[in-house]
């Protein structure tokens, strides 16, 4: 068996998505098609009720189905359009279950710097001096899903002889010093 210990919830989720995929195949074309249909329907519904020239952050935050809470300086972190796209993707993710839900959450997380008004090449997130324009959240998500699935497929084809099945991989979200493991149960630490 393999045990991973991550103190960060996001790191723990990334570890689970990267290590527990073998018994949960994802049909990339179906997933992208389903996300696209949902996204386009919600996008059109929103713009049928709001003028494209005058949408603001509050309109997006008040949108039925939005799960993103208001937070300080939201208008500096997102354009209204990028916030709407992110809101729709989050709504879609919340409709999913299990591995697919975690997979999509990691895909969105990987693209947040490209979606928000931040410079992508800096270690610490800072506002961009000029807001990012024409952010296509759906396109970014589709490319990230394809990239992640390619990585999974490459791993399956090149490393299948060393992969463990999902039930023998455990990711513990905790501090390694506070995790109770049986004596002599660890043979390697990475």
Model feature map: region roles:
Residues 2-6:
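Conserved SAM-binding motif I beta-strand of class I
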Residues 10-89:
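Conserved phosphoryl-transfer catalytic core
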Residues 79-190:
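SAM-dependent nucleic-acid methyltransferase catalytic core
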């Amino acid at each position: 068996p393999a045990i991973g210990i991550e103190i960060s919830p996001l790191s723990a989720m990334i570890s689970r998505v990267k290590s527990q995929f073998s018994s949960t195949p994802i049909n990339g074309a179906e997933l992208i098609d389903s996300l696209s249909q949902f996204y386009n329907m919600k996008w059109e519904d929103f713009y049928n009720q709001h003028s494209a020239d005058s949408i603001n952050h509050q309109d997006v935050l008040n949108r039925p189905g939005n799960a993103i809470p208001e937070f300080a300086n939201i208008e500096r972190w997102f354009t209204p359009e990028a916030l709407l796209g992110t809101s729709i993707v989050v709504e879609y993710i919340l409709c999913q279950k299990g591995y697919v839900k975690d997979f999509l959450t990691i895909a969105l997380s990987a693209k947040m710097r490209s979606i928000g008004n931040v410079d992508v090449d800096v270690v610490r997130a800072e506002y961009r001096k000029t807001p990012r324009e024409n952010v296509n959240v759906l396109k970014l998500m589709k490319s990230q899903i394809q990239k992640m699935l390619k990585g999974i497929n490459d791993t399956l084809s090149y490393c299948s002889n060393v992969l463990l099945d999902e039930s023998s991989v455990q990711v513990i979200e905790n501090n390694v010093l506070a995790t109770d493991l049986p004596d002599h149960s660890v043979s390697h630490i990475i």
